[in-house]
Curated annotation (Swiss-Prot):
Record Gene3D superfamilies: BAG domain
Protein name per its UniProtKB record: HSP70 co-chaperone SNL1
Record-level GO cellular component terms: endoplasmic reticulum membrane; mitochondrion; nuclear envelope; nuclear membrane
Function, as annotated: Stimulator of ATPase activity of molecular chaperones of the HSP70 family (principally of the SSA class). Stimulation is important for HSP70-substrate complex dissociation after folding of newly synthesized or refolded proteins. SNL1 is probably involved in nuclear pore biogenesis and in particular the folding or refolding of misfolded NUP116, GLE2 and NIC96.
Swiss-Prot/TrEMBL keywords: Chaperone, Endoplasmic reticulum, Membrane, Nucleus, Signal-anchor, Transmembrane, Transmembrane helix
Membrane-related topology note: Single-pass type II membrane protein
Recorded GO MF terms: protein-folding chaperone binding; ribosome binding
Location within or outside the cell: Endoplasmic reticulum membrane; Nucleus membrane
Pfam families per the UniProt record, alphabetical: BAG
Domain of life where this protein originates: Eukaryota
Other facts: Present with 3346 molecules/cell in log phase SD medium.
Length: 159
């Protein structure tokens, strides 16, 4: 654009009233709102979509999940330790290099996950359980805790 054309537009803009700018802004907002809203929608579309999603979800999962028994909860933690972290931690212990940042990250990760499992075991409440059932559950939980603590001790020795 030449300098004269620029001056021409500047003079036109300076003569334009504020109400014109406000009117243009309102038109722009209405235009944007119209574009974003689906055709024929009066604001109820999100509710309709949500109810359709809920209907689909109800058909897929009609039954609520059954809570795990206390023994299953302990077994679950034990299996997760055995399947996910025990081998991974042992492998790390065998090849650990203090200078390797990946090994340090892996050690910290395993440490955090093992602590998470300990917290999960700690949250299993055995207080209101019948005494005949409580003893074996406590022993089982104690055994898993000792395994995890031994691994944590081994990982801590890598520092």
């Amino acid at each position: 654009m030449s300098h004269n054309a620029m001056e021409h537009w500047k003079s036109k803009l300076s003569k334009t009233s504020t109400s014109t700018y406000v009117l243009l802004a309102v038109i722009a907002v209405v235009f944007l709102v119209t574009i974003r809203r689906p055709n024929g929608s009066k604001g109820k579309s999100s509710k309709k979509r949500a109810s359709k999603k809920n209907k689909k979800g109800k058909n897929q999962f009609e039954k609520a999940p059954v809570p795990l028994t206390l023994e299953e909860q302990i077994d679950n933690v034990s299996l997760r330790y055995g399947n996910e972290l025990e081998g991974r931690s042992k492998d790390l212990i065998n090849r650990f290099d203090v200078e390797d940042e990946k090994d340090i990250y892996e050690r910290n990760y395993c440490n955090e996950m093992l602590l998470k499992l300990l917290i999960e075991l700690d949250s299993i409440d055995l207080i209101n359980v019948d005494e005949s059932l409580r003893r074996p559950l406590k022993e089982k939980r104690k055994g898993v805790i000792k395994e995890i603590q031994a691994m944590l001790k081994s990982l801590d020795s890598l520092k």
